[in-house]
């Protein structure tokens, strides 16, 4: 399973990319707004750091507006992927854009039916929201499993599954076990994934033992 980072914070992206573990970035209007910078400027800078898919979301609600925005965003860099909301207007836009060779990531997926429709429209990626489903008492990982099963039944479906709305390391591991192609993970969760109490204890013990090793003057 591939790992993307879900952020628009340049420092977080640089740090996570330096670990050698991420190969893409997802953003959304909320994440961009937190940075207080020009949208295109942020996307362009991210593209200069990470050589992989960079998802940038449209804000129009009508297909015509989505298509116009998408064409404009796609000009920023070859790695830009257009995030489109899962609506009937979004499906119309994805259908047109896929025929033009513009990659799309259909977001706000909360059912297998939505994922199937997005794939049929030509989406490059679908993003089921794991954490938000868990928030309302449903099982986000079960949705990932459903979509994986459906897509695997039909080899002509090339759409990749991005496990999104990741809240903690267990979500990442469960998404990997379920067969998601990608998990897009907030920086704080990536940090949590690096840590274990026994690792810290082990390092401390090694250092104490090293202090006991005789040193030549």
Swiss-Prot record:
Q: Where are the transmembrane segments?
A: none
Location comes to: Cytoplasm
GO molecular-function annotation terms?
aldehyde-lyase activity; transaldolase activity
Q: Which GO terms describe its cellular component?
A: cytoplasm
Which pathway does UniProt place it in?
Carbohydrate degradation; pentose phosphate pathway; D-glyceraldehyde 3-phosphate and beta-D-fructose 6-phosphate from D-ribose 5-phosphate and D-xylulose 5-phosphate (non-oxidative stage): step 2/3
Signal peptide region = none
Could you tell me which cysteines form disulfide bridges?
Answer: none
List this protein's GO terms for biological process.
Answer: carbohydrate metabolic process; pentose-phosphate shunt
Q: Where is the active site?
A: 83
User: What EC numbers are recorded for this enzyme?
Assistant: 2.2.1.2
Q: Please give the superkingdom of this protein's source.
A: Bacteria
One Pfam family from the UniProt entry?
TAL_FSA
UniProt keyword list: Cytoplasm, Pentose shunt, Schiff base, Transferase
Its UniProt entry gives the catalysed reaction(s) as: D-sedoheptulose 7-phosphate + D-glyceraldehyde 3-phosphate = D-erythrose 4-phosphate + beta-D-fructose 6-phosphate
Belongs to which family?
Belongs to the transaldolase family. Type 3B subfamily.
Q: Which HAMAP family match?
A: Transaldolase_3b
According to its UniProt entry, the function of this protein is described as:
Transaldolase is important for the balance of metabolites in the pentose-phosphate pathway.
* Protein name in UniProt: Probable transaldolase
Q: What is the lineage of its organism?
A: Bacteria, Bacillati, Bacillota, Bacillota incertae sedis, Caldicellulosiruptorales
